[in-house]
UniProtKB/Swiss-Prot annotation:
Involved in peroxisome biogenesis. Belongs to the peroxin-16 family. This is Peroxisomal membrane protein PEX16. Residues 1-80, 131-335 are cytoplasmic. Disulfide bonds: none annotated. The lineage of its organism: Eukaryota, Metazoa, Chordata, Craniata, Vertebrata. GO terms for biological process: peroxisome organization. It is a multi-pass membrane protein. Keywords: Membrane, Peroxisome, Peroxisome biogenesis, Transmembrane, Transmembrane helix. One of its GO terms (cellular component) is peroxisomal membrane. Residues 155-164 have a biased composition (Acidic residues). Residues 66-81 are annotated as: Required for peroxisomal location. The keyword Transmembrane applies. It comes from Danio rerio. Residues 146-168 are annotated as: Disordered.
Length: 335
């Protein structure tokens, strides 16, 4: 156990001192997940495992960097833990579904799906009603904007040097005294840089969730309950019935309509509302609508583009092969 602790401490130090290398590692792991897909048997499961690992790696590294930059999330420790667990569930849900189907068959797969959706609904209800977290975002913990954060840290470290410079009264030139100059190797041959603070960064760090009234709370509750109601409808009416598709769509549209009346949203909440509006288009790709109407048209369009538009085939043909697999995964479609 002590050995694992030392290894983790070394890894934390590595991330703190080399954030660019950590980002490169995350990108490499994610690219590896794309390269694995379709290469051999069970490649889709392994590809999804690697992709989930890349997301968890980003979550871990962001947590390390936030501590190093003193950029803690504006909430209690218990709320942060709930958000972290919710993020982990969202990152691994597809792989867990695929693994359950492989190990325990269709019955085990649906049991795992129901358990994950119940766990997510419980966590979101706690965040909504106990912690008053407002509109739930996805992912629950927004990834750290490392470029702006690290740039802000560099500017803070140079603040003393900036204070020691002065501006000539007549010429208006910014002059740095010789005593405050850095070493020759790290010297910059330009004007001292001014401290820049990103408005978006400050808003993201310090803005509190927009308080929800009764109407908005009902709307968000509908959004949280939608997956469970959809699963219950699937169990009662069957996979080929239109009723689960219609019920889910009505709940999502109702929730979105009630929330769209809110005006004073912060930046993250506005982004979440745009994401939810875009995800309404997913109903064109969800069965039974996809099976009866969308499938033939989408495949025809992809085949036409692959045959007649140079270069598009590199993307269109793998997409045509992957669409049937994508349709079989619940969390790809309905998660």
């Amino acid at each position: 156990m002590e050995k694992l602790t030392r290894v983790f401490e070394r890894y934390q130090e590595y991330v703190r001192t080399s954030p660019a290398a950590a980002s490169h590692l995350e990108s490499t792991v994610r690219a590896l997940s794309y390269l694995i897909a379709g290469r051999f048997s069970d490649s889709h499961e392994i590809s999804e495992l690697v992709y989930s690992a890349s997301n968890l790696l980003v979550l871990l590294n962001d947590g390390i960097l936030r501590k190093n930059l003193s950029r803690t999330l504006p909430m209690s420790i218990s709320q942060q833990k709930l958000l972290t667990w919710l993020s982990v569930l969202e990152y691994v849900e597809v792989f867990v579904e695929m693994a359950a189907a492989k190990m325990w068959g269709d019955a085990g797969r649906w049991l795992v799906i129901v358990l994950i959706q119940i766990a997510k609904a419980v966590l979101r209800c706690l965040l909504l009603f106990w912690y008053k977290s407002g509109i739930q975002t996805s992912p629950p913990i927004i990834p750290l904007d490392r470029d702006s954060q690290l740039c802000s840290q560099d500017n803070n470290e140079e603040e003393d040097d900036e204070d020691s410079s002065f501006v000539g009264q007549r010429s208006g030139r910014v002059v740095r005294p010789l005593g405050s100059a850095p070493s020759l190797q790290s010297r910059l041959w330009g004007l001292p840089r001014k401290k820049k603070v990103s408005r978006n960064q400050e808003e993201e760090l310090h803005s509190s969730p927009t308080p929800l009234g009764l109407q908005e709370t009902i709307a968000e509750s509908l959004y949280i309950a939608r997956p469970l109601l959809h699963l219950a409808s699937l169990g009662i009416c069957g996979k080929r019935s239109w009723k689960p598709w219609i019920l889910s769509g009505l709940l999502e549209i109702t929730s979105f309509s009630l929330l769209s009346d809110m005006k004073a949203l912060n930046r993250r909440e506005r982004a979440e509302m745009r994401r939810r509006a875009f995800l309404l288009l997913y109903y064109l790709l969800r069965s039974p609508f996809y099976d009866r109407y969308s499938e033939t048209k989408i495949l025809f369009l992809l085949r036409f583009l692959a045959d007649y538009v140079p270069g598009v085939g590199l993307v269109a043909r793998p997409l045509m092969e992957y669409l049937p697999i994508w349709q079989k995964i619940y969390f790809y479609n309905w998660g």
